[in-house]
Amino acid sequence: MLALLKQFSEKRFVWFLLAFSSLALESTALYFQYGMGLQPCVLCVYERLAMIGLFVAGIIALLQPLAFILRLIALALGLFSSIKGLLISFRHLDLQMNPAPWKQCEFIPNFPETLPFHQWFPFIFNPTGSCNESQWSLFGLTMVQWLVVIFSLYVVILTLLLIAQVIKTRKQRRLFN
């Protein structure tokens, strides 16, 4: 199975799927903000940045999927982004499920001074909403719960792909070849 996953990771389609799915989710977030009028909070902005990290990881490996080092860089960036996104989503879910006056998120994103994304790209990274509000749901799950599911899937898939890259597998012996 690991050999199959390694072969699978050497195909451009896999990395295109990663880049396309994260771009589609980012586009959906922008539609929710500008099309439906839902206001993003600080944690939503951080989750968006994690999604953009997944997009960049997909683009890196899409350049040359047969290059081992590019695959490893893409997997490391993708796994870091998906784990970070999952942790932020868990924190966001805790704020929504267990609201309390002392549990609030900040109003201004805490980006490094050298990378003030909220000033460079305010149409994507400028938070205007509250983290405690649940504004949308689908099939009984809120947007944050969907993000927990999505980031969990990314973590599992990228972890399996990373394991397939580093663990040596025995070649299959064929009897009739």
Curated annotation (Swiss-Prot):
The chain crosses the membrane at residues 15-31, 50-65, 73-90, 146-164. NCBIfam families: PRK01749.1. Disulfide bonds join 41-44, 105-131. Residues 32-49, 91-145 are periplasmic. Required for disulfide bond formation in some periplasmic proteins. Acts by oxidizing the DsbA protein. It holds the Pfam family DsbB. Its main location: membrane. GO terms for biological process: protein folding. Keywords: Cell inner membrane, Cell membrane, Chaperone, Disulfide bond, Electron transport, Membrane, Oxidoreductase, Redox-active center, Transmembrane, Transmembrane helix, Transport. The keyword Cell membrane applies. Belongs to the DsbB family. It is found in: Cell inner membrane. One of its GO terms (molecular function) is protein-disulfide reductase activity. SUPFAM superfamilies: DsbB-like. InterPro entries: DiS_bond_form_DsbB/BdbC, Disulphide_bond_form_DsbB, DsbB, DsbB-like_sf. GO terms for cellular component: plasma membrane. It comes from the Bacteria. This is Disulfide bond formation protein B. It is a multi-pass membrane protein. Residues 1-14, 66-72, 165-177 are cytoplasmic.
